[in-house]
Amino acid sequence: KDIDFVFGVGGDDKKNSSSWILTEWKTPKIDRVWGYYRDLHSDGPGVKVKELTVNPNSKLSMQMHDHRSEHWHVSYGTATVNTAIDNPEQYSTIKLTKDNTINIPVGTWHQLCNNTDDELRVVEIQHGENCIEEDIIRHGVDPYYGK
């Protein structure tokens, strides 16, 4: 009748959560130099939904896509977005805060930056003939990435 519990449930002894384990199993993190992303949904080759988490004071490369457009929705933090039509060195910059959105058409140069000391989270909806990671053209050699 004298039973000692060795494993705690919650409280100070809680080491993990089943909801965290389930999230990692369903949508594993894909680590990148700028943070990470999770694939949230894919509806065939033409639609993909991701959540991007950009580390403080980090940025993605200046890039464009031949086969997909993107729609970004800031869910947390402040984003600085650089876009250009023809010449990626002649870009315009806008700031987006929580619940702001931007559409990035096919063939538009774009760069997502987090110039703050807080995490940035963006929901990205890709739409096009083929939403694959290989559909990316980076501008020049980015010293941040070394490629």
Residue ranges and their predicted role:
Residues K1-R32:
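Classical nucleotidyltransferase
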Residues T23-M62, T93-K98, I136-K147:
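A short, N-terminal "cap"/entry segment at the start of jelly-roll beta-barrel domains
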Residues K59, H71, T78-T80, T101, ...:
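Structural motif
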Residues S61-M62, V81-T83, E124:
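Short hydrophobic/aromatic-rich beta-strand segments that constitute the beta-sheet cores
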Residues D66-N87:
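Glycine- and acidic-residue-biased ligand/ion/polar-headgroup-sensing regions
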Residues T83-W109:
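Short acidic-glycine-tyrosine-enriched beta hairpin
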Residues Q111-K147:
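Double-stranded beta-helix
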